[in-house]
Amino acid sequence: PTLCGLETYAGVHHLVSVVTGDLRDGLDALDLLEGTFPGGSITGAPKIRAMDIITEIEGDARELYCGAIGRIGFDGALDTSIAIRTVFMDDRQAVLQAGGGVTLLSEPGPEYDETLAKAERVFEAFA
């Protein structure tokens, strides 16, 4: 297990936590997935009200963005990651979703700059 481990990538630092545990009897990996996503580090708290506000502001459901990408093993093990800085493509366009961690003390200008910095590396991959 890791709590807020710092990982450094080209152009961005990222805090990563690894959580392990055992499910109560009668629950499976799908119950765990339903109970933990979207991740609290993405939504804020309280989670349900925060997601209501996010939907009001953004106008659409996030779908895969900030959802789970992962696998469920034949042994019932669940291994997931939160889909951030995600590109959705169809035959006509590519749409990039990225963001920063807004808090009560956040200032719009620096938050916007952080979002652009995070998205820049993805843009470069398409250049």
Stretch-by-stretch model annotation:
Residues 1-4:
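Metal-dependent catalytic core segments for phosphate chemistry
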Residues 8-127:
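Conserved hydrophobic core element of enzyme catalytic domains
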